[in-house]
Design a protein with these regions (language model features):
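Short glycine/serine/threonine-biased micro-segments
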Residues: 36, 60, 99
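A beta-strand edge to alpha-helix "cap/lid" segment located at domain peripheries
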Residues: 12-23, 67-138
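Structured beta->alpha junctions
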Residues: 32, 58, 85-87
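Hydrophobic pocket/interface hotspot
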Residues: 31, 43-44, 51, 62, ...
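Short, low-complexity N-terminal intrinsically disordered segments enriched in polar/charged residues
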Residues: 2-46, 137
């Protein structure tokens, strides 16, 4: 298995993760730029009306709730994102980014890198999951 030979039920890695880059396009590029500009209206405009966000195991549903989350925790805490890696996984986009800001950093690593799992439909974010993953030994 370590030599690239996979059983018939698994796809080779290059088919599963089609693109690995640090370049952003479309609504995700707009979203990250708006976050880094602390622009509440522009951030909210990247989401569909019925979008779903899971931020560190907290569920936020609908554009009104997302606006409150953005105002308080993104813009309010001056969060910035430095993109480290972008992966296209069957049309969903995974963005690994370094997070910084004025939020409480107690018990967090000096360099906080989190994974952002985006699903996009019709040019809008329909779901976003923000997760602080742990390194996998696999």
């Amino acid at each position: 298995m370590g030599h690239g030979v996979l059983d018939s039920h698994r796809r080779p890695k290059e088919e599963t993760l089609r693109t690995m880059t640090t370049e952003l396009t479309g609504v995700i590029a707009e979203h990250i730029a708006a976050v880094n500009a602390f622009d509440t209206d522009a951030i909210v405009a990247t989401f569909a009306a019925d979008a779903y966000v899971n931020d560190n195991r907290r569920e936020i549903h609908g554009v009104d709730a997302i606006r409150r989350w953005v105002e308080q925790e993104m813009v309010g805490d001056r969060v910035t994102l430095e993109v480290r890696e972008v992966l296209d996984h069957h049309g969903d986009i995974i963005v690994r980014a370094r997070y910084d800001g004025t939020f409480d950093k107690t018990n967090l690593p000096d360099e906080l890198v989190m994974s952002n799992y985006f699903s996009i439909r019709e040019g809008k974010i329909i779901s976003l999951a923000v997760i602080r993953n742990q390194h996998s030994p696999y």
